[in-house]
Swiss-Prot record:
Necessary for normal cell division and for the maintenance of normal septation. The keyword Coiled coil does not apply. CDD domains: YihA_EngB (cd01876). It comes from Ralstonia pickettii (strain 12J). GO terms for molecular function: GTP binding; metal ion binding. It comes from the Bacteria. This is Probable GTP-binding protein EngB. The keyword Cell division applies. GO terms for biological process: division septum assembly. SUPFAM superfamilies: P-loop containing nucleoside triphosphate hydrolases.
Amino acid sequence: MSLLHQARFFITVNHLRDLPATAVPEVAFAGRSNAGKSTAINILCNQKRLAFSSKTPGRTQHINYFSVMPAKAEDPLGFLVDLPGYGYAEAPGETKSHWVHLLGDYVKARQQLAGLVIMMDARRPFTDLDCQMVEWFLPTGKPIHVLLTKADKLTNNDASRALMAARKVLADYRAQIDGDVSLTVQLFSSLKRRGIEEAQRIVAGWLCLPEALEAEPQAEPAKKTPSPNAQRG
């Protein structure tokens, strides 16, 4: 069983000054208000009500932390960080301004942030605000993984085209910066439970969870070269 299944609520913060003063890695989840972010987090953690989505899109303005650790452990191994959903057109101006500063400053400056998962509706990926999130985080050189959510709403052909198009966008972003940065994408469906294990592996790897280390392929032992003087039977 993945340690992600044992994630539990840790803290809610509304200002960067209140972020946990811990050194363990964090994986943040971002996305538009209607991209299925909370549902995806719950599915990845195999829980029904870990992350809550407001009945009114755009109302959640806080950063929610969920600790990941074995049941009897005293200290978290890492955190899942649920960022406020963005892009709700009817949100008040002050709320939008708060989102910009909270989201932008967190993803650009949080040292503990190991990677960013961005949820995008597979039918409408890479909106202007999605691209803004990528561009905020890209200069850090840390990995980004895109979940194309609600993939069940597309036919197989349309889903394949959406995946190829998303890979092209990420390749263009990768070409803009120096160095090798991991920008990956996958199809995801909470309804059909598609892509769950792939996403879990990536998140667990970024958090350096024991299950990720155990899953790493082991190098084959080097084969000994017979000595030319070895005695043949």
